[in-house]
Amino acid sequence: MKKLLILVSLTVFSFSNAIAVTLYDALNQTYQNNIQLNAERENIKASEQDINISKADFKPSLTISGSKSFENTNTLKNQNGGTATKNDVDPFTTSIKLEQTILDYGRDLTLERNIISLNLAKAQLVKKEQDTLHNAINAFTNLILAREKFNINSKNLNLLIKQVENDKIRRDRGQITNADVAQSESSLAGAQAQFAISKSELLINKLNYENIIGKINDPNTLKKNSNSIVSIPKTLNDAINLSKQNNPDIQIAKLDLEISEKDISIVESDLKPTASVSLEKSYTDDLSSTIGERDKDTLKATVSWPFSLGGKNKYKVNKNTNLTTRKRLLLDDIVKTNETNVASAWSNMEASKSFLNSVKVQLKSSKIAYEGITAEYERGSRTTLDVIQSNSLLLSAQLSLVSSERNYLMAQYNLLKAVGLLNSQYLKLK
């Protein structure tokens, strides 16, 4: 028993010479290094390049070209059928052309669409931030919970080891029976099993933490918080109003609808006129048998207005109209669902808070009862079973408290996520 007690004591993580890791530190680490977030940031950069590409269509194009041809006339006859003199030429032509599109409805609409797409990419990044940071908070709090359960079960195991040793001494003195010792040993076996489980859970949650957030050497360095590191909405109405403005799912659905509406306009622009002007300067050497060289300037204006594309345009408009109707319905559904989700998150937070307060009262009562029963047991007025049952209730209350504290904290962050505030800007991450 003594060897087991020493082993348990050595297994518990030490707090000495450790630098505390706060939730804010862990979230910053996740925000900077998470692969999925970095991928979404690249998506924003790609959307920015789409805007640059669209803007380039508004600028003039400059084309330089040159050609060289070699001619070999095999037969050349006059109108009367006689053979004409063959004078082969090898023309060489160079040109430079400056062209500017001055009217293109599709070009304007495409730029507007790409600007909306950039806003969509930013909203998708916010959504990914929420999911990633929520996972990080979950991993952080789960590791703290596993650590506390491990410590509680460790202390309980040490307590029951001493209990068995004391009961054996009292049995040898004739104060209790073998049945009492057997009860203590049975309780110890259960505590050993719970300790093994809590040790395994601690390892699993440590690995999960490292997978989501990053390397951690000692789980005891994690600093526990009772409340969220940022303020939460004060009332349910405040939460609902904030969610309408900030929930990324709503923002994404709105932007998807705007893009779909813009797609209709782009398709319709296929039947609208376009206009361009160009200026070309060309030089040709050895142009023909009668002309040695030519230097020419050409100013050209072009207007194009397609009137029919065989019905293809009509079907494209119909298709995009159907898609727009679909996205409008999806937006309406998300807006309705959002209010329900926020109300549910708020209700769960309030319930978690009430349950936590009840567990605190339960733990206080369990401590008083255990101390009283233990004292009475020492005086011989209580049985071993009374002590074991009282200790079991105390252990249950202790485990329930740490779980309730964690659940209440997560409920606060669940509300922030439902509202749309669990992002880098609101959390002030760098």
Roles of regions detected by a PLM:
Residues A18-S67, T73, I216-E258, P306-F307, ...:
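Bacterial Sec-pathway N-terminal export signals of envelope proteins
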Residues S65-Q100, K223-P233, S265, S278-K316, ...:
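Small/polar, glycine/serine/threonine/aspartate-rich low-complexity segments that form flexible
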Residues N28-N38, K45-P60, S95-R113, N119-Q130, ...:
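A glycine-/polar-enriched beta->alpha junction
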Residues V21, D25, D131-Q245, D256, ...:
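Periplasmic alpha-helical coiled-coil/stalk elements that build and connect Gram-negative outer-membrane
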Residues M1-L4:
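Positively charged n-region of N-terminal signal peptides that target proteins for export
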